[in-house]
């Protein structure tokens, strides 16, 4: 554990300490609890490890409280001109573990430049900065894409106005989210809306994330029903029994066919969100290249706001 090491007296020594901890794994009472080089599962330990390290060597480490709150960290960085580390690839688990150390280096430099103590840096991040970032209350745009997401919905989830969820980083604010509840429910149970653009959180196990809300409950559509449906029985995700469901893009035809199934159950699909389809101009006469811009592109862009 951390207590087996000497306290670092430089950034280089602090980095060596951190690399050693994430590489050698975790031992508990003499037993190897997490194997060496298991960086994928080490991701789950980074946040609590940051608490211990920030007490052991506060000069170089800080408590990381932005897990599932990466949106706030990004806003703080934008507001105060802080360059965050490059995002490692999803499967680069060691690089993702090292993301925390790279943040430590960046905030160490920020602290020194601004004459802050370790405690003052923590107060800056989790009090001053959080209170100064803009909580934008913008309208939800019309959806341009529909996505499947999945996972159990527990009673506490259903009582929340919004919740943090795994999804595709390409998800845009306002997009439609078709929620498949996994076993033992094994059915599509509701349709939700993405309240934010998708982002990547390197220290979040599932990488891509969004905030979702505006849940509309629908009649359950079971996996068995979809497997028996003429259209969905041929759909690759249904054939995979919704494995890898989170962030699976739906075509406009997929969503239309889903509305068909929902309507057949007697549900008023007029209450459900519709995919945005721009109105194309009528009586278009294209003769030269400039006509494309004036008669098609400009009206299309105007209709999109």
Which positions does each model-derived feature cover?
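Helix-hairpin-helix
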Residues: 35-56
């Amino acid at each position: 554990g951390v207590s087996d090491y000497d306290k670092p007296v430089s950034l280089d020594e602090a980095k060596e300490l951190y690399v050693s901890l994430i590489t050698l794994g975790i031992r508990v009472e003499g037993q190897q609890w997490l194997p060496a080089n298991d960086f994928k599962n080490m991701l789950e330990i980074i946040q609590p490890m940051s608490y211990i390290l920030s007490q052991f060597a506060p000069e170089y480490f800080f408590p990381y409280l932005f897990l599932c709150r990466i949106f706030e960290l990004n806003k703080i960085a934008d507001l105060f001109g802080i360059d965050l580390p490059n995002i490692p690839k999803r499967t680069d688990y060691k690089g993702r573990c090292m993301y925390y150390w790279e943040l430590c280096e960046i905030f160490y430099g920020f602290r020194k430049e601004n004459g802050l103590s370790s405690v003052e840096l923590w107060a800056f991040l989790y009090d001053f900065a959080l209170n100064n970032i803009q909580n934008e209350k913008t309208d939800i745009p019309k959806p341009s894409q529909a996505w499947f997401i999945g996972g159990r919905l527990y009673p506490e989830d259903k009582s929340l106005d919004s919740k943090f969820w795994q999804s595709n980083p390409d998800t845009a604010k306002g997009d439609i989210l078709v929620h498949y509840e996994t076993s033992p429910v094994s059915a599509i149970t509701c349709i939700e809306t993405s309240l934010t653009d998708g982002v990547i959180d390197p220290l979040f196990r599932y990488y891509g994330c969004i905030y979702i809300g505006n849940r509309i409950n629908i009649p359950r559509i079971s996996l068995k029903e979809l497997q028996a449906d003429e259209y969905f029985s041929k759909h690759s995700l249904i054939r995979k029994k919704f494995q890898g469901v989170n962030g699976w893009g739906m075509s406009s035809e997929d969503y239309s066919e889903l509305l068909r199934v929902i309507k057949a159950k007697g549900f008023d699909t007029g209450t459900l969100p519709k995919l945005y389809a721009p109105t194309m101009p009528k009586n278009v006469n294209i003769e030269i290249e400039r006509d494309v811009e004036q008669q098609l592109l400009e009206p299309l862009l105007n209709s999109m706001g």
